[in-house]
Amino acid sequence: MATKSLTVVVSQSPSRNPAKRNLEEELVAACLVDDTVDVAVVPHLYNLDAQHSGTMFLKSIPGHLVLLSWMYPRASHWLLDRAGIKGRQGETLLDEEMDDEDIEIPEPAGIGGVDVPDRNIYCLDLGVDDDPGVFLDEIKRIVSELNVETVELMDWISGSPQPEQLERYLDPMSVLGGEADLEPVKRRWYPVIDYERCTNCMECIDFCLFGVYGVDTLDRILVEEQDNCKKGCPACSRVCPE
């Protein structure tokens, strides 16, 4: 079977909104008959912990990746990064809705990511449009732009957890229909650092009372104990100068 240049992952909405579910299903159904991409479905990205099989599955994906989720692209990218699913931020042509199109966004002056592999991760916000064709056209554009060879998805499914656990994610329609016996998730609340904007000023670690933040071996700020974060607490984001 020919190798595919791109893997498309749909991260489900945490709600049971029928319009959102319908959009997810239409996208998956279209990708399943597209012989240029692999497609899979995982639970809402924010609710996956480091040991969840959904996280392990995402780590097993080789090559370039398109993530379709109900989050802003920056948030999606850095959620993946903090889980060890790294790559360059792929440029997309989908426009985010903005309250004021004349707002000038300064160039990021952050410390940036580390150990970024030679692949692109394209994060698309499903909230931008309710027409699946908009996203499918963008996926086709990305495929034609990449035109690279990668090893097949199944070749990478090994190790822990067991392959049969990860293979469930390769049957996306059963996941969407609730037929797959997937590991459950619970709603979580924790901060995510955007290292393109973070200047390592340490205001958040100084301000947080709950021991959420720490530093790595390079003395860079990181989220060390995310589940210590108190639900609804916005303190660190408010004190952040960026």
How should each PLM-predicted stretch be described?
Residues M1-S5:
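Glycine-rich phosphate/diphosphate-binding loops that line cofactor/substrate pockets in enzymes
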Residues S13-R16, V66, W70-A75, T199-F210, ...:
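Local cysteine-cluster metal-coordination motifs and their immediate loop/turn environment
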Residues V8-D137:
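Cofactor-cradling patches in redox/metallo enzymes
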Residues N17-K20, L80-R82, E101-F207:
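Ferredoxin-type iron-sulfur electron-transfer modules and their immediate structural context
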Residues D38, C204, G214:
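Residue-level detector of anion-binding/catalytic polar loops
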Residues G178-N200, G211-R238:
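Ferredoxin-like iron-sulfur electron-transfer modules
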Residues L32, T36-V37, I85, S144, ...:
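Generic secondary-structure signature for well-ordered alpha-helical cores
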Residues V9-P14, L93, L209-F210, V215, ...:
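Proteins with a high burden of low-complexity, intrinsically disordered sequence enriched in S/T/G/P/A and R
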